[in-house]
């Protein structure tokens, strides 16, 4: 689609176009469009729209196509790019439904100036996005990282796991707040998650044998109200998650591959919550190799090798945080429930030195092994399966 050819002019781009290229700089207040059209002197044009004005956006695209046809006598398709961010994927889906070739890019993967104080405007960002799109369509390697947009069903399916994690984090906050308030009064044995929490609150005495102050007791009572609401919501979310897993893990029809959720649940040491996160956050997607799997979870290494300087910077963490956290937790559980597996033996052979780094390496190896197991049916060496129900 793109062919190099000489051009004149200091701001001309050395490319012959077979399409109209548009970058979208999205924000809460307005959208900035940067376009590059055939027959327009190879100059970038910019337009501004109100945020969310999808009708105005499509009208602008129609105008760009009309002007390009007037100049060249040919119809050209539109190719767009915008950063993954606050707007999610709804704009991308609208454009695809309109027959527009749309790309979503990881903003952190686009090269920028490394000066400590660099200019940053919507105009500069829009032009940088457009240059990245042109290079990507020319087939240049490592230009940027395009995001694979999930389907609406995939996006909705992972809501339950994420909502549960949010509720658990809020529960921890309330429990710690209650414990902190009471510890300041010399009370260290109160457990807010016990069923008799209300009854025990009435009988509490401070470290100097006084009844709880009135306002403190009232505050803790309100904290318990919020805590109990959270506990009820967690139970409801977990019930929905169990129902979804039950539907996903039903036996596949004869002649079809086994269901991935059922395969994960069959492995000893993997429970319903871990299986739900593994499937909805990672293993439901398509990967070409193990490096892509590790990179998607943010478990890939980041070496620094320049001349005589060679060292490791640690994990990139440029990936799915829910999947990464779950895999590190699952790695510890794997050592407990699968001590005779090849992965556990590999971990023990490394000894106590570098235990923190080793558990992350085990998490990476385990994720790759589970991916091979789910997608290709490769049994994890030495792994024990749960007994059939």
Task: Indicate where each model-derived feature is located.
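A detector of single, family-specific signature residues
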Residues: 1-389
């Amino acid at each position: 689609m793109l062919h190099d050819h000489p051009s004149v002019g200091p701001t001309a781009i050395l490319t012959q176009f077979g399409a109209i290229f548009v970058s979208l700089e999205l924000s809460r207040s307005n959208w900035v469009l940067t376009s590059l059209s055939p027959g327009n002197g190879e100059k970038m044009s910019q337009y501004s729209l109100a945020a969310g004005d999808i009708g105005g956006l499509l009208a602008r695209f129609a105008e760009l196509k009309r002007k390009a046809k007037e100049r060249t006598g040919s119809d050209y398709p539109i190719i767009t790019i915008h950063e993954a961010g606050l707007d999610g994927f709804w704009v991308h889906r609208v454009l695809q439904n309109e027959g527009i070739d749309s790309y979503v890019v990881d903003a952190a993967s686009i090269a920028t100036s490394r000066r400590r104080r660099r200019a940053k405007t919507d105009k500069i960002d829009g032009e940088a996005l457009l240059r990245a799109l042109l290079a990507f369509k020319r087939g240049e390697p490592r230009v940027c990282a395009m995001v694979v947009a999930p389907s609406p069903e995939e996006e909705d399916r992972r809501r339950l796991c994420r909502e549960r994690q949010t509720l658990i984090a809020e529960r921890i906050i309330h429990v710690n707040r209650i414990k902190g308030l009471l510890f300041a009064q010399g009370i260290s044995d109160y457990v807010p998650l016990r069923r008799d929490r209300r009854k025990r609150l009435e009988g509490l005495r401070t470290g100097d044998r006084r009844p709880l102050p009135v306002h403190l007791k009232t505050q803790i009572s309100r904290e318990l109200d919020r805590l109990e609401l959270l506990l009820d919501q967690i139970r409801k979310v977990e019930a929905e998650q169990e129902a979804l897993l039950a539907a996903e893990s039903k036996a596949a029809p004869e002649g079809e591959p086994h269901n991935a959720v059922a395969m994960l649940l069959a492995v000893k040491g993997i429970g319903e919550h871990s299986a739900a996160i593994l499937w909805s956050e990672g293993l439901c997607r398509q990967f070409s190799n193990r490096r892509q799997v590790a990179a998607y979870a943010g478990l890939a290494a980041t070496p620094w090798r320049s001349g005589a300087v060679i060292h490791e910077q640690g994990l990139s963490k440029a990936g799915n945080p829910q999947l990464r956290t779950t895999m590190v937790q699952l790695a510890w559980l794997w050592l407990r429930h699968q001590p005779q597996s090849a992965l556990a033996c590999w971990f023990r052979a490394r000894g106590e030195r570098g235990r923190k780094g080793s558990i992350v390496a085990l998490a990476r190896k385990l994720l790759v092994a589970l991916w091979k197991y789910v997608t290709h049916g490769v049994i994890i060496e030495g792994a024990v399966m749960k007994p059939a129900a």
